[in-house]
């Protein structure tokens, strides 16, 4: 009775292997972000900005300078997600015995010769090279069986890197301004500010992982935001906030069994490891702070190099 119940269960498991719900990770559909990815990217950015310690800026007028690493791109993952034929790969062939009989035609040749009163008679028997009859007989039955495991592997990932998405940069800027406003800190134009706050967004992207085992499978999408910030008093050029790093990771995970499911979907956010290199240990030469704070606003002649206006002016005038 148990054996009869076990057979249809095993049959159903093998038939339903690789059947489930596919969620585009990281994206399917012409490069457009889908809702889960948007949620993760926004969550990691919100957490990183919300965790900024801004107490030293209370009562000050702040000018914000935000620089973002290029993050926009597109990618596709092909292959992977194995299907089970069986747990092993092999083949067994049982071939029947085959016997073939050939019948070759034979012909007789007689030659008579006479010379000087003597007569000779020669008789020869020859066999043709081509058979006149062929008969093939097979004894026994033949069979062929095979077992196998077809694995698509981890898949092939192809990506394309583009420039920074201006909408992502604007979104980050709005998040920062929102947090400053809710903390009671005034964000003003650079001309009216007494404090400069610099925020460098080093990491702002997604990570996709796939786990493939015989019984357990998982799809994971992670979004990370890592930033470093500091604040400078314009009057005395002192650091109100020394360089600090915030790093958060939001994750979405689908769990499968034999690629059936997902039977469990989980989401979460947590702090992650910081930047590989930060500026928290940098000190000014001779315990002296420069006359001008770094600037991320570049004119047409030095665009993209991050020089301050004072440094550019000195360079043009030939000053050291």
From Swiss-Prot:
Spans annotated as Disordered: 288-320
Keyword Signal appears in the UniProt entry: yes
BP term (GO), one: cell adhesion
Keywords assigned by UniProt, alphabetized: Cell adhesion, Cell outer membrane, Lipoprotein, Membrane, Palmitate, Signal, Virulence
Topological type in the membrane: Lipid-anchor
Lipid addition sites, S-diacylglycerol cysteine: 19
Keyword Signal set for record: yes
Subcellular location field: Cell outer membrane
Family: Belongs to the MafA family.
Protein name: Adhesin MafA 3
Organism listed in the record: Neisseria meningitidis serogroup C (strain 053442)
């Amino acid at each position: 009775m148990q054996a009869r119940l076990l057979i249809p269960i095993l049959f159903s498991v093998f038939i339903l292997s690789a059947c489930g719900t596919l969620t585009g990770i990281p994206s399917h559909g012409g490069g457009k972000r889908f809702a889960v990815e948007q949620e993760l990217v926004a969550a990691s950015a919100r957490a990183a900005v919300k965790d900024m310690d801004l107490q030293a800026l209370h009562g000050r007028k702040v000018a914000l300078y935000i620089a973002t690493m290029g993050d926009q791109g597109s990618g596709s993952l092909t292959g992977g997600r194995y299907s089970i034929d069986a747990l092993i790969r092999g083949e067994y062939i049982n071939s029947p015995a085959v016997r073939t009989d050939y019948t070759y035609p034979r012909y007789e040749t007689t030659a008579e010769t006479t010379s000087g009163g003597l007569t000779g008679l020669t008789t020869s028997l020859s066999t043709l090279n081509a058979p006149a009859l062929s008969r093939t007989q097979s004894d026994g039955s033949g069979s062929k069986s095979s077992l196998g495991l077809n694995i698509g592997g981890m898949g092939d990932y192809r990506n394309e890197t583009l420039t920074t998405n201006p909408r992502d940069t604007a979104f980050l800027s709005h998040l920062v301004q929102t947090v400053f406003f809710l903390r009671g800190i005034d964000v003003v134009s650079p001309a009216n500010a007494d404090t400069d706050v610099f925020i460098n967004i080093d990491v702002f992207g997604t990570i996709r992982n796939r786990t493939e085992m015989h019984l357990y499978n998982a799809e994971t999408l992670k979004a990370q935001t890592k930033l470093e910030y500091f604040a400078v008093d314009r009057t005395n050029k002192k650091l109100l906030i020394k360089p600090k790093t915030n790093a958060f990771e939001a994750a979405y995970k689908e769990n499968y069994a034999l690629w059936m499911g997902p039977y469990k979907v989980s989401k979460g956010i947590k702090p992650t490891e910081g930047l590989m290199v930060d500026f928290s240990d940098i000190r000014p030469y001779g315990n002296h702070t420069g006359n001008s704070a770094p600037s991320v606003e570049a004119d047409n002649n030095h665009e993209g190099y991050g020089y301050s206006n004072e440094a550019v002016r000195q360079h043009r005038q030939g000053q050291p």
